[in-house]
Amino acid sequence: MSKETKKPFRQSVAEWRQFVYNPNSGEFLGRTAKSWGLILLFYLVFYGFLAALFTFTMWVMLQTLSNDIPKYRDRISSPGLMISPKPDTALEFYFNKSDAQSYAEYVSTLRKFLETYDDSKQSQNINCTPGKVFDQNDVAVKKACRFNLSELGQCSGKEDKTFGYSKGTPCVLVKMNRIIGLKPEGEPYIQCTSKEPGAVEINYFPSGGLIDLMYFPYYGKTLHAHYLQPLVAVQLAINSNSTNEEIAIECKILGSPNLKNEDDRDKFLGRIAFKVEMTE
């Protein structure tokens, strides 16, 4: 079998140059200017059509959505619970009541959080009727109910600037996550329990941990711009015999049949658990 004759290097270079540009036929990379123009025109029209189709499809979809209210809201039927301050160490509070530096971050977080609830920031909010859902479906601009810091009692930061941390009675603020259109039934309230009986005495502000219905429903950030979530302050009076011990606390929403507090797939649905350890 004869071997193929290898082309000289100069011949290969000449053929490559001719392929890139053929001066006899005026072809560039094997195509004339007309051929290149037709190909570019085809792809311009083709991809332009795809872009226009995509844009039109997105425009049609956006026409079905509201800027104010999510279209689908059935996946989240019950709110979760959140607390403030929120420790960096996985919802575990560690502090020394004799060392201001150990709880300084907690106090700072609470002060900053409550700034939005200051009377000066609620000038556009109104006094609502307690115990009654505040429906505003027929009003374009929704009014927000005033939340008075005095409702938080000893945890308001007015009388005790350390929110009880310097006295061994730390305060934790509990709130429900916002859900547009949610109308709690019954008389919802927050109840916290300790897994170590007798380790801590729990006090609530407002009394009984009540969450007033007048703060519902919520209409969304756009329509309800000045809305403030109702808060429940939980004050933990730690027993002197329980210092240097880790105390597990769990808070739940109770008193409302349409607010869930048990779900194995979502540990924050209607409840929240945290730990507190105080030293002296």
Curated annotation (Swiss-Prot):
> What ranges does the Extracellular topological domain annotation cover?
63-280
Tell me which parts of the chain lie in the Cytoplasmic compartment: 1-37
Which Gene Ontology terms of cellular component type are present? sodium:potassium-exchanging ATPase complex
The membrane topology of this protein is: Single-pass type II membrane protein
Main localization (coarse): membrane
User: Which keywords annotate this record?
Assistant: Cell membrane, Disulfide bond, Glycoprotein, Ion transport, Membrane, Potassium, Potassium transport, Signal-anchor, Sodium, Sodium transport, Sodium/potassium transport, Transmembrane, Transmembrane helix, Transport
The glycosylation sites annotated in the UniProt record are 96, 148, 241
Q: Tissue specificity, please?
A: Predominantly expressed in brain.
Q: Which GO terms describe its molecular function?
A: ATPase activator activity
**Protein name (record):** Sodium/potassium-transporting ATPase subunit beta-3
**Could you tell me which species this protein originates from?**
Gallus gallus (Chicken)
Q: Encoded by which gene?
A: ATP1B3
